[in-house]
A protein has these predicted regions:
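Hydrophobic residues in well-ordered beta-strands that form the structural core
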Residues: 94, 119-121
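Beta-loop-alpha module in the N-terminal Rossmann-like domain of NAD(P)-dependent dehydrogenases
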Residues: 52-111
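Predominantly a Rossmann-like dinucleotide-binding segment in NAD(P)-dependent oxidoreductases
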Residues: 118, 125-162
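Short, Asp-centered acidic motifs that coordinate Mg2+ and/or phosphate
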Residues: 32, 52, 67-68, 118, ...
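Short, well-ordered coil/turn segments that N-cap beta-strands
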Residues: 28, 67, 90, 115-118
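Hydrophobic C-terminal alpha-helix "anchor/cap" residues
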Residues: 22-23, 60, 138
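Short, conserved SAM-binding/catalytic segment
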Residues: 43-50, 111-115
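N-terminal Rossmann-like dinucleotide-binding module
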Residues: 1-48
């Protein structure tokens, strides 16, 4: 298996939850960081022992040092960044949402089909205790097939509607 050489863009609080997970995965051999705020990128490099800092997204996706990108920016940038990374030949992992415009979603799908690159939208809400509780509960109710429409919790402790 080819090792992942991953560049993280958007070094904010949410990204901080993912860098250590990727960093410690045996399939990952190289971690770079990128943020529009230089100080934040430098802090991430030091804190997570990143191999390199890129100061612009364009510089990062143009680099041969990485083969994949993890997008943790503002959600209105997810689609355009994923498209640019895929066009640059990079695999993409993105925080939700995939994009805000249907056209961007369709373009991501088109590029993935054409290139064979991997795109993964990192939906993590399905692992919340409240979501797990609802799925388990649905399996025990009258042996019927149930579909969860909404699961809302506060601090992942109380289930209000399932």
């Amino acid at each position: 298996m080819k090792k992942l050489r991953i560049g993280f863009v958007g070094c904010g609080q949410f990204c901080a939850n993912f860098v250590p997970i990727f960093r410690n995965h045996p399939a990952v051999e190289y971690v770079a960081v990128c943020d529009k705020f230089r100080e934040r990128a430098e802090k991430f490099k030091e804190e997570y022992n990143a191999d390199k800092i890129f100061y612009t997204f364009d510089e990062m996706i143009a680099s041969d040092e990485i083969n994949s990108v993890a997008i943790f920016t503002q959600r209105d940038l997810h689609g355009v960044m994923a498209i640019a990374a895929l066009k640059a030949g990079k695999h993409v992992y993105s925080a939700v949402p995939m994009a805000l415009k249907v056209e961007e979603i369709l373009e991501i799908v088109r590029i993935v089909k054409k290139t064979g690159l991997t795109y993964s939208m990192g939906e993590t809400g399905v692992y919340r205790p409240s979501s797990i509780f609802c799925r388990k509960k649905m399996l025990t109710v009258n042996s019927k097939i149930w579909f969860m429409e909404l699961c809302f919790s506060q601090l992942a402790t109380e289930v209000f509607y399932c």
